[in-house]
Amino acid sequence: MKTNSEEQMIKLFGIPLSDKPRWQQFLICSSGFFFGYLVNGICEEYVYNRLKFSYGWYFTFAQGLVYIALIYMYGFRTKQMVNPWKTYVKLSGVLMGSHGLTKGSLAYLNYPAQIMFKSTKVLPVMVMGAFIPGLRRKYPVHEYISAMLLVIGLILFTLADAHTSPNFSIIGVMMISGALIMDAFLGNLQEAIFTMNPETTQMEMLFCSTVVGLPFLLAPMILTGELFTAWNSCAQHPYVYGVLVFEAMATFIGQVSVLSLIALFGAATTAMITTARKAVTLLLSYLIFTKPLTEQHGTGLLLIFMGIILKMVPDPNPNPKSSGSGQTPGKLERVKFEKEDDEESRPLV
């Protein structure tokens, strides 16, 4: 076993993070995440709403190809892998299942209903963390309350601007619930991989997940005919590919930043950050376009800020397996499997 000084350090595009103070780690990773997904939102608004191109599977496939090219340019090669391919087969299966169920649920749920469900993502992430072998995270009560405040606040803020009420369908509810469970499993599985094998890099996880995941996209594209329709439409408007490449480059920064957050702070904290990002994006749209803010908007914002502040309260009884703090500061520590019970020592995949 390697000593702490020999352990792999987490880096974000060459910036060493493991030896920095926690607040600097958080600021750097969050900034990369917010930048990437703010650009992503602008590009999606342009492509989906302005150009009326709703080819989600095809665009995701194109984005994956850009990811692979960028990671290859960054210098990653498969010989640098420290995890077996089967790890990423399961990871990609969950990822594509979540994407498919979320996309499919739109046929049965209207936008406000889907927002309500997707906003609760942080809660199943926290619950699922207790059942992942090698992770077994337990969170203090105040973190559950913090997550609830954040979720309720975001729902109130979002629905304040909804022109229609949430419309529920049992099939849609089952699909979006399945997507949430897969999302929860995905984040915790990524955290467990980083925890059980600290030499895992963000580039390895993103590259392997993308390479394994792309074939999963071919079946729905071919079966729905989207592959040929999207190809013909984009051939008539080739500038769309320029937008897609630019968006993929930005979201690449966001994705690597998210994986860094998971490795350093854990899946639950990362889920709270991604949830808070939605609130920040919505608030910016109101400030930039000077939309009127109602009392319900104010109530939602108040609950969101209360949840964020409560999240910052330190745990009075710290436990290495509790909270969503991810890896310890400084050099990453390996999980000592010999000190775990049989269930904890069971292979992750």
Swiss-Prot record:
Protein name in UniProt: UDP-galactose/UDP-glucose transporter 4
Region: Disordered, residue numbers: 316-349
Keyword Nucleotidyltransferase recorded: no
Compositional bias annotation for Acidic residues: 340-349
Pfam families from the UniProt entry: UAA
Transmembrane segments: 23-43, 56-76, 115-135, 140-160, 167-187, 205-225, 248-268, 293-313
Family (UniProt): Belongs to the nucleotide-sugar transporter family. UDP-galactose:UMP antiporter (TC 2.A.7.11) subfamily.
Organism: Arabidopsis thaliana (Mouse-ear cress)
Keywords per UniProt: Antiport, Membrane, Sugar transport, Transmembrane, Transmembrane helix, Transport
Molecular functions (GO terms): antiporter activity
Membrane topology recorded in Swiss-Prot or TrEMBL: Multi-pass membrane protein
Compartments, record wording: Membrane
Main location: membrane
Function: Sugar transporter involved in the transport of nucleotide-sugars from cytoplasm into the Golgi and/or the endoplasmic reticulum.
Cellular component terms per the entry's GO annotation: membrane
